[in-house]
Swiss-Prot record:
D-glyceraldehyde 3-phosphate binds at S156, C157, T158, T187, T216, G217, R239. Plants contain two types of GAPDH: cytosolic forms which participate in glycolysis and chloroplast forms which participate in photosynthesis. All the forms are encoded by distinct genes. Its main location: cytoplasm. Keywords: Cytoplasm, Glycolysis, NAD, Oxidoreductase. It comes from Ginkgo biloba (Ginkgo). This is Glyceraldehyde-3-phosphate dehydrogenase, cytosolic. The active site is at C157 (nucleophile). One of its GO terms (cellular component) is cytosol.
């Protein structure tokens, strides 16, 4: 921690999530952004990309400007900029970075992410699912974090939406089995027009004018953060031509019979209690753009869901897959720091 008591963070990869994690960090008084690494963007271009955002609007908290080729100024706050391609070359230690947000989408396993430790960082939070780093979803299993874990994953935006909802339903009524569909906004890996995508042919089709079926590991990943649900959930995705905000459709068979009103009441109670700020609840006639900038992980839409019987129900929950997720990255870091 810095002399001000703030947690010092660095960001590797200044893409969608990297820039929004920076915004979230700069809006908080318990976090200090001290360094950013991106080999593909100059400092003046970083300033422009940070300041102007087609989805979340212009940054208005303070002026952002270039001090020199290695320093950005956010108001009076200087942030060091590196341009290293290899994580082990980034001198995080020189700037006092304790926690690195690994948001390139490239270094998602423990071995690759560990390179940041060589550069002087103490901990790494991967902003994507990881095949071998332990995954944490704030509000669900972050209490299982142990201080000796140096590299962790914040899971995916969809897992962060699904897991709190699934936890409430499983705790209260028990889930026998379930299927999830996420209707998901476009992301950076998609194509503006039809183009090559060898591993996912459908994913190479134009994002702006297609509904594209896709795979997602989000439902299975819930089994990693909630072992009681391991093997009970799976799912798929539809990529749709919206710039941000996605929605989870969770259809489950319940162990304990419950009316839809009882399910709504349970979710509402949790949203105002232990999961306040993580799980939301609304009975308004909302649509996707109403959730742009919502920092909660999952907002249950009481009017959109429907029950077939007391044991079989469809539940609908919204999430800003960019802003909500980026908010949880910072929350996870704050929780990790509190255990030291």
């Amino acid at each position: 921690m810095s002399s001000t008591g703030k947690i010092k963070i660095g960001i590797n990869g200044f893409g969608r999530i990297g820039r929004l994690v920076a915004r979230v960090a700069l809006l908080r008084d318990d976090i200090e952004l001290v360094a950013v690494n991106d080999p593909f963007i100059s400092t003046d271009y970083m300033t422009y990309m940070f300041k102007y955002d087609s989805v979340h609007g212009q940054w208005k908290k303070h002026e952002v400007k270039v001090k020199d080729s290695n320093t950005l100024l956010f108001g009076e706050k200087a942030v060091t900029v590196f341009g290293c391609r290899n994580p082990e070359e980034i001198p995080w230690g020189e700037t006092g970075v304790e926690y690195v947000v690994e948001s390139t989408g490239v270094f998602t396993d423990k071995e690759k992410a560990a390179a940041h430790i060589k550069g002087g960082a103490k901990k790494v939070v991967i902003t994507a699912p990881s095949k071998d780093a332990p995954m944490f979803v704030v509000g669900v299993n972050e209490h299982e974090y142990k201080p000796d874990l140096a590299i962790v994953s914040n899971a995916s935006c969809t897992t962060n939406c699904l897991a709190p909802l699934a936890k409430v339903i499983n705790d209260r009524f028990g889930i026998v089995e379930g299927l999830m569909t996420t209707v998901h906004s476009i992301t950076a890996t998609q194509k503006t027009v039809d183009g090559p995508s060898n591993k996912d042919w459908r994913g190479g089709r134009g994002a702006g004018f297609n509904i594209i079926p896709s795979s997602t590991g989000a439902a299975k990943a819930v089994g990693k953060v909630l072992p009681a649900l391991n093997g009970k959930l799976t799912g798929m995705a539809f990529r749709v031509p919206t710039p941000d905000v996605s929605v989870v459709d969770l259809t489950v068979r319940l162990e304990k019979p419950a009316s839809y009103d009882e399910i709504k009441a349970a979710i509402k109670e949790e949203s105002e209690g232990k999961l306040k700020g993580i799980l939301g609840y609304t009975e308004d006639d909302v649509v996707s753009t109403d959730f742009i900038g919502d920092n909660r992980s999952s907002i249950f839409d009481a009017k959109a869901g429907i029950a077939l019987s007391d044991n079989f129900v469809k539940l609908v929950s919204w999430y800003d897959n960019e802003w909500g997720y980026s908010s949880r990255v910072i929350d996870l870091i704050v929780h990790m720091a509190s255990t030291v």
